[in-house]
Regions:
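Regulatory modules associated with amino-acid/nitrogen control
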Residues: 1-103, 131-148
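A structural feature that tracks compact, well-ordered secondary-structure segments
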Residues: 93-127
Length: 148
């Protein structure tokens, strides 16, 4: 269960399950310029992260299928579903994803977490998406009933 300070945050949270299937891709860092150019027209939800070792992409599987021919070397994993926590989270908020991660870990559900400036998102294997939503909705309902 979340801390008493976190209960109202979870009680106010809505979940959004994105309808598309997604792929997580790792490209060699040398392909950064090509990746940034090719992925300019990506539609939401998508993400590009560049670090010293790789270019990591999250995009709709249908978009990746059209573009992967440009990259002879890559690693990828799919299908994933994206779940957005539809609540604006203050950057000073501590522990939101740790609560989510712990509850889902107890259920044997692995997550890939993505944070943006305003919201957090998780990716789960598509076959686990419905169960993940159920577990998270139960958490939200428990927080709502405790808050009342």
């Amino acid at each position: 269960m979340p801390s008493p300070e976190m209960m109202p945050v979870f009680a106010s949270t809505k979940l959004k399950l994105h309808p598309d299937e997604y792929t997580i891709v790792s490209l060699p860092v040398e392909k950064q310029d090509m990746a940034l150019e090719l992925f300019k027209p990506l539609s939401p939800f998508s993400s590009i992260t560049v670090d010293t070792e790789e270019v990591s992409l999250i995009l709709k599987t249908s978009e990746w299928e059209k573009m992967k021919e440009h990259f002879p070397v890559f690693e990828s994993e799919a299908p994933y579903s994206v779940i957005t926590f539809d609540i604006v989270l203050d950057l000073s908020l501590v522990g939101f994803l740790s609560v989510v991660s712990a509850i889902l870990a107890d259920e044997g559900i692995s997550i890939y977490a993505i944070s943006t400036y305003l919201r957090d998102h998780i990716m789960v294997k598509t076959k686990e998406a419905d169960r993940t939503i159920q577990v998270l909705e139960e958490l939200i309902q428990r927080c709502k009933s405790t808050n009342d």
